A protein has these predicted regions:
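Charged, low-complexity C-terminal accessory regions
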Residues: 1, 14-17, 28, 131-136, ...
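Active-site beta->alpha loop and helix N-cap motifs at the rims of alpha/beta catalytic domains
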Residues: 3-21, 26-213, 351-357, 372-395
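Generic preference for well-ordered secondary structure
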Residues: 20, 60, 67, 85, ...
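Short amphipathic alpha-helical segments, especially helix-boundary/capping motifs
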Residues: 37-38, 79-85, 153-157, 218-222, ...
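General structural feature for long, well-ordered alpha-helical segments within catalytic domains
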Residues: 65-68, 72, 100, 104, ...
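Alpha-helical scaffold segments in soluble metabolic enzymes
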Residues: 107, 181, 221, 292, ...
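Catalytic alpha/beta core domains of metabolic enzymes, predominantly
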Residues: 189-327
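Structured C-terminal cap/extension of enzyme domains
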Residues: 266-395
Length: 395
């Protein structure tokens, strides 16, 4: 028995699981849906990784434990997931600049090819100075540089929405011109990733409109005029109703990738008019249970699929708990659970984000994950949870 702290400061007894659920990786991708998971980056615990920047300190490249970082991707490929690399889960622009992101994509692509896994890499415009304005030509060239690199290492391209483009574009035509130029040059179909201002206010007015329906029409027009170059789209955060609307306006054959934390079981299962696929950050820490659900769906067992994925919702929502600012520290939970699960040997992070979640929050994550049987070694997980409690003065 272990006593876990509650948000009000009291301690509540909890009896950890003694026998973890059995998960047998199949090393084969899912067949019923395309399922991407992102994956966190493992920091080098012995290095002087910089603390959170205030905006005026010189940038210092992060020190990454590459072996542990790539090993976690191997865990995901073995479960059947494709891996989406160098997005916000990997500290993109929150510790990792383009140079570090490129190295991450290169190493992950090399390992993906070795094990037969699917890999995609995010392209952005983050090599541009964020403190000064840039022309459309500058932004286009930045995108082109990163696309050339990602394609060159054999990864699929995910084109992320650019804050610099949002700042510079004067009309919907400017957005359309940039994206059509990039898509015309792409050698393989890409994923278009549009983040809404609810998550990143810098992207307000993307596609030249602040109205959702008008922006969606402009976005869909770009996809429809380049349908042979678009594998799929991800828009986040969107409601259940808006994701279904997105599915209805996309051309046939273009995947709509879900990444939410509330309705993903139903949206991915779909309805008589179609379904979503997945490009989800939250699948990384939930991988064994999520994989079991998709294996059931592959076999036509929708009842087990629903039960497995719905069982993860309380933990998924807890990992992203908080307002728009604190929600960004979901990576702390991801690293914490990876450490408890034995995927890495320490609980240290780039920018010192291991301290970004409260001890009661981490304790609840432990309890929910243990309840799902996510820990391969329940005794190890309990021991490491006790270390966190002792560090906080809880004995």
């Amino acid at each position: 028995m272990i006593e876990l702290p509650e948000p009000d400061g009291t301690l509540a007894p909890y009896e950890p699981s003694t026998v973890p659920r059995g998960f047998t990786p199949s090393n084969a991708p899912f067949t019923s849906r395309v399922v991407f998971s992102t994956a966190h980056v493992v920091a080098d615990p012995m290095a002087a990784n910089t603390t959170l920047l205030l905006g005026f300190e010189p940038f210092r490249p992060p020190a990454i434990d590459w072996d542990a970082t790539i090993a976690f991707r191997g865990h995901l490929w073995a479960q059947g997931f494709a891996v989406a690399e160098a997005l916000d889960t990997q500290n993109r622009a929150m510790g990792l600049d383009w140079s570090a992101s490129a190295e991450l994509i290169r190493r992950s692509a090399q390992e993906a090819h070795a094990v037969g896994g699917r890999i995609a890499g995010g392209v952005w415009t983050d090599q541009l100075d964020p403190m000064r304005p840039h022309s459309i030509a500058d932004i286009t060239a930045a995108y082109e540089e990163q696309i050339e690199f990602v394609e060159g290492v054999g990864a699929q391209t995910i084109i992320m929405a650019s804050p610099q483009l949002a700042q510079t574009a004067a009309s919907p035509d400017d957005y359309a011109a940039v994206y059509r130029h990039l898509l015309a040059q792409a050698t393989t179909p890409v994923i278009l990733h549009w983040v809404l201002p609810e998550s990143d206010p810098r992207l307000t007015g993307y596609w030249g409109h602040t109205d959702w329906d008008a922006a969606l029409d402009a976005f869909a027009a770009v996809v429809k005029s380049n349908v042979d170059k678009v594998d799929g789209v991800k828009v986040w955060p969107v409601s259940r109703e808006r994701e279904i609307q997105l599915r209805r306006v996309m051309p046939e054959g273009v995947h709509v990738y879900n990444g939410d934390i509330t309705d993903f079981p139903e949206l991915i299962e779909g309805d008589e008019q179609g379904h979503s696929d997945a490009l989800a950050s939250v699948f990384g820490p939930l991988a064994p249970v999520i994989a079991g659900g998709f294996r059931a769906l592959d076999a036509g067992d929708t009842e087990t699929y629903r039960a497995e994925l719905k069982s993860t919702l309380p933990l998924a929502q807890h990992l992203f708990e908080g307002d728009a600012l604190s929600m960004r520290f979901f990576k702390t939970d991801f690293v914490f659970l990876a450490w408890l699960s034995g995927h890495q040997e320490h609980f240290r992070m780039i920018w010192g984000e291991q301290s970004a979640r409260s001890v009661p929050h981490l304790a609840k994550a432990y309890r929910l994950a243990d309840g799902l049987g996510l820990f391969p070694d329940a005794d190890l997980a309990e021991h490491r949870m006790r270390l966190v409690l002792e560090t906080a003065g809880i004995r």
